[in-house]
């Protein structure tokens, strides 16, 4: 049934992994053959870096959430913002209950908002940002911005755009760990560019 385990393997001294390792045949095959052939293991230094990152993850997440909540409060005061989509802002009682139950410390740093206007205004806003990087990644330590309709979701149909609430004026932000005053100043710079565009 599993010839790679039961039959002699010419590339590994002609052994049968079932005969040589018994119940550990599959694990031995993975280590002796697949790991050797594909290199599917990180180097010791990469393992060290991964561990370093995991050890400080909770601190970074706290900062992401703290910054995000402050950005949301700021965006609620901006006249050029048409709407904001973040779990903490839902007015639905059931969604609020779920938010408080499952995200007592905040629901992360990724959300969208709709700027007044259309694609031209959205792109002017994005182009004016300096701290935010124009990238499709999410949850990076640095703040990120993207126009979903023309990038990450561009393959969708108009019906799918409407179902997903992705419009010409939708902007996705991923709030990073930078100083909150710098983040908000950068967003203000974006809104100033939109004002200048429509002046």
Mark where each language-model region is.
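PLP-dependent enzyme catalytic core of the Aspartate aminotransferase-like
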Residues: 127-128, 143-199
């Amino acid at each position: 049934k599993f010839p790679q385990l039961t039959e002699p393997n010419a590339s590994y001294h002609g052994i049968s992994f079932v005969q040589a390792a018994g119940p550990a045949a599959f694990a031995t095959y993975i280590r002796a053959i697949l790991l050797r052939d594909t290199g599917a293991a990180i180097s010791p230094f990469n393992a060290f870096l991964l561990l370093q990152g995991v050890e400080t993850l909770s601190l970074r997440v706290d900062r992401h959430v703290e910054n995000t909540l402050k950005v949301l409060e700021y965006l609620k005061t901006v006249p050029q913002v048409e709407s904001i989509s973040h779990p903490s802002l839902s007015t639905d009682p059931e969604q609020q209950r779920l938010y408080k139950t499952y995200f007592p410390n905040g629901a992360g740093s990724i959300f969208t908002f709709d700027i007044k206007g259309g694609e031209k205004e959205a792109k002017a806003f994005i182009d004016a940002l300096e701290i935010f990087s124009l990238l499709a990644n999410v949850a990076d330590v640095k703040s990120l911005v993207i126009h979903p309709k023309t990038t990450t979701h561009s393959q969708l149909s108009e019906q799918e755009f409407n179902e997903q609430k992705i419009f010409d004026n939708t902007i996705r932000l991923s709030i990073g760990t930078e100083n909150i005053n710098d983040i908000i100043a950068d967003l203000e710079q974006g809104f100033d560019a939109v004002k200048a565009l429509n002046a």
